[in-house]
């Protein structure tokens, strides 16, 4: 492992020199003077070097490509963090392609047999050794099960884990170094960025997780005319092997074939938007890697086109609170109610509670007013979210991984929709959906569901009160962090008092002694006083 790490260090150093990345680093304004002086003294900087006629973004992209698949995927993720990177670098990194030569089919067969505990011919009536596709983490082979179903077999590359561990370790070293030497770099939270990437890449190595994601998404859209997700064959899925139904669709970027079958492009673009908002707000579970390579269009019913989604390795979800704040933010934003947008960011905890709402409102207005001078159909929903996040970052907005995934997915969906139908008015499609969703949040059915959830909290009420009293009785209690239930964005005061009333009502209804009421009223008063402190 140490030898591998040392070799990777030498490789990184050679790539840095080849693409003059040291020049880019030394030009960073956040770099302290002593590190700039140290960098200027590096030995290779005194040697004659040919001039590179490349932009800084192109140099970084080529360097990441040279460093291999793990750095390529890191660059792809960085390209979605436009709240952190300049546009020219983010645009260049978006061109990174996660395509690498396939590994030998003999190794694929060996890994499949090891994972399934059976010979390949015992499981498959046919197995195509030439892969359909190959990427940095896995490659895909076509096959037919003994039972006759046409399937694809996804298999993780062998000997990948040691390389990933080594590369991730170096990324962490570089991120920690950046945080240590520059306060400006600390503001960008590079360690958190690498940590998010580590989670993403580790999750992609577990194909059982991807299978579960695909099953969930398929169930959410069962029978839907909007989206089809291939079936997972669980009997043949393992951590490093995934077997799914093979689909035959048209790549969404193959516009010529879609035209030949007379696809309704307007309906196709609008359905993409509807799928996104359905996943985010109805299901709170969304496919977060919907780039064109993972999206196909069914050949059936081109006048009512249906999407087909594959590769569910990366998904996102939102809490009820995040859903609510996001919907209200978007509606307020398009009504140009910047005060409400600023207040919602503070109320949600996305920016610190001590943020001055007037200053935040003014910053949002300055960034967003020029956007709204365009016709609504020309406004990019994804860019709106991006500018909002960039502004919020200046006010110390904490990284919200789920919102970053959502913004990236929205940019993909919107870009795809405009490619299919340039006149797409995303807001016209989204607004009715959001307003309907907000109305359903206060419908009798939803209120009853919320009421039932309140009842479920009743058994924990007395324990919560005891825990709070015990915490406050401890030395330095006022400096301790609040309990998780108190720091939640819910209005716990209202909930607890409501729960007390429910308990009393339940006791009366069950014929319990009415003398229990004073105790509950006292508890309510005590909790009220505690929470008011």
Swiss-Prot record:
Keywords: ATP-binding, Cell inner membrane, Cell membrane, Kinase, Membrane, Nucleotide-binding, Transferase, Transmembrane, Transmembrane helix, Ubiquinone biosynthesis. It is found in: Cell inner membrane. The active site is at residue 289. The chain crosses the membrane at residues 24-44, 510-530. It is an enzyme of class 2 (transferase). Pathway: Cofactor biosynthesis; ubiquinone biosynthesis [regulation]. Residues 126-494 form the Protein kinase domain. InterPro entries: ABC1_dom (IPR004147), Kinase-like_dom_sf (IPR011009), UbiB (IPR010232), UbiB_bact (IPR045308), UbiB_kinase (IPR050154). ATP binds at residues 132-140, 154. Its EC number is 2.7.-.-. GO terms for molecular function: ATP binding; protein kinase activity. PANTHER family: CHAPERONE-ACTIVITY OF BC1 COMPLEX CABC1 -RELATED, PROTEIN ACTIVITY OF BC1 COMPLEX KINASE 7, CHLOROPLASTIC. Belongs to the ABC1 family. UbiB subfamily. NCBIfam families: PRK04750.1 (NF003404), UbiB (TIGR01982). This is Probable protein kinase UbiB. It comes from Pseudomonas paraeruginosa (strain DSM 24068 / PA7) (Pseudomonas aeruginosa (strain PA7)).
């Amino acid at each position: 492992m140490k030898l591998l790490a040392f070799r990777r260090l030498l490789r990184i150093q050679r790539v840095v020199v080849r693409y003059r990345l040291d020049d880019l680093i030394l030009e960073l304004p956040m770099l302290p003077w002593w590190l700039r002086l140290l960098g200027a003294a590096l030995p290779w900087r005194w040697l004659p070097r040919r001039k590179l006629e490349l932009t800084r973004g192109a140099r970084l992209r080529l360097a990441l490509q040279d460093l291999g698949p793990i750095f390529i995927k890191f660059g792809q993720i960085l390209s979605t963090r436009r709240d952190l990177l300049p546009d020219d670098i983010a645009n260049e990194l978006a061109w990174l392609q996660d395509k690498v030569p396939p590994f030998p089919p003999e190794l694929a067969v060996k890994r499949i047999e090891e994972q399934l505990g059976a010979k390949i011919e015992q499981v498959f009536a046919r197995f195509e050794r030439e892969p359909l596709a190959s990427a940095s983490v896995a490659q895909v082979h076509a096959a037919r099960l003994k039972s006759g179903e046409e399937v694809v077999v996804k298999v993780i590359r062998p000997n990948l884990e040691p390389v990933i561990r080594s590369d991730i370790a170096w990324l962490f070293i570089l991120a920690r170094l950046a945080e240590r030497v520059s306060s400006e770099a600390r503001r960008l939270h590079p360690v958190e960025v690498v940590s998010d990437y580590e989670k993403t890449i580790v999750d992609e190595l577990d194909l059982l997780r991807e299978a579960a994601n695909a099953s969930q998404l398929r169930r959410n859209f069962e029978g839907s005319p909007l989206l089809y997700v291939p079936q997972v064959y669980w009997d043949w899925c393992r951590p490093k092997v995934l077997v799914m139904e093979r689909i035959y669709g048209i790549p969404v970027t193959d516009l010529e074939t879609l035209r030949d079958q007379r696809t309704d492009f307007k309906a196709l673009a609008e359905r993409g938007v509807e799928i996104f908002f359905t996943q985010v707000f109805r299901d709170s579970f969304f496919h977060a890697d919907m780039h064109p390579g993972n999206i196909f269009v069914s050949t059936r019913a081109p006048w009512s086109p249906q999407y087909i989604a594959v590769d569910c390795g990366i998904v996102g979800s939102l809490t009820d609170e995040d859903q609510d704040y996001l919907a209200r933010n978007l509606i307020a934003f398009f009504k140009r109610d910047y005060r409400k947008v600023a207040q919602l960011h503070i109320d949600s905890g996305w920016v610190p509670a001590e943020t001055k709402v007037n200053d935040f409102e003014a910053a949002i207005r300055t960034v967003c007013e020029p956007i709204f001078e365009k016709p609504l159909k020309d406004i990019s929903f994804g860019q709106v979210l991006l500018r909002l996040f960039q502004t919020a970052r200046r006010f110390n907005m904490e990284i919200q991984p789920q919102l970053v995934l959502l913004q990236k997915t929205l940019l993909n969906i919107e870009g795809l929709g405009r490619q299919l139908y340039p006149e797409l008015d995303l807001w016209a499609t989204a607004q009715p959906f959001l307003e309907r969703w907000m109305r359903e949040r206060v419908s009798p059915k939803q209120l009853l569901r919320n009421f039932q959830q309140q009842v479920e909290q009743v058994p924990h009420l007395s324990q919560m009160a005891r825990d709070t009293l015990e915490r406050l009785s401890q030395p330095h209690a006022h400096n301790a962090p609040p309990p998780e239930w108190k720091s939640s964005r819910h209005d716990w005061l209202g909930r607890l008092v409501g729960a007390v009333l429910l308990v009393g009502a339940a006791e009366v209804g069950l014929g319990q002694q009415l003398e229990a009421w004073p105790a509950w009223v006292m508890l309510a008063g005590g909790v009220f006083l505690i929470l008011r402190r």
